[in-house]
Amino acid sequence: MALAATGCMSRGESNNSESSTTADLEISVSIRGSEAPTKSWTLHCPPGGTLPDAAAACSKLGQIDDPFAPVPEGTACTQIFGGPEIAAVSGTFNGKRVDTEFSRGNGCEIERWKRVGFLFPGVS
């Protein structure tokens, strides 16, 4: 999925703290149209898993309202391309099922990617 470079979404900061954030996530990033290997991580909150700096990731996730929400249907988005990467996130977050993809195919998707970009280390 594509990274959103413009502020198409208006989701604020959450009152959650790292200690109240629970997650059991599988994260992968692949490059559309490439034979490059897929990069994969796990994230568990309380902090654990293979994602670098899991403690910071748990803390950041706890500060974002609905970090895995899709771009609302009907949203007008700028038509810019942010890159061929596609990120998939699945598992549970704060007791809710997560099964979503992120891309950088338009401005809204770029912004959505940027909100949780810390989950995709090494992907610019």
Task: Please identify what each model-predicted range represents.
Residues 76-124:
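Extracytosolic low-complexity repeat regions of secreted or lipid-anchored proteins
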Residues 24-28, 42, 88-90, 99:
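Beta-strand secondary-structure signal
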Residues 1-6:
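Sec-dependent bacterial lipoprotein signal peptides
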Residues 44-89:
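Mature extracytoplasmic domains of secretory-pathway proteins
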Residues 28-50:
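N-terminal first-folded block
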Residues 17-33:
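Post-signal peptide N-terminal segment of mature Sec-exported envelope proteins
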Residues 22-24, 38, 84-86:
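Extracytoplasmic
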Residues 7-12:
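Bacterial signal peptide processing site
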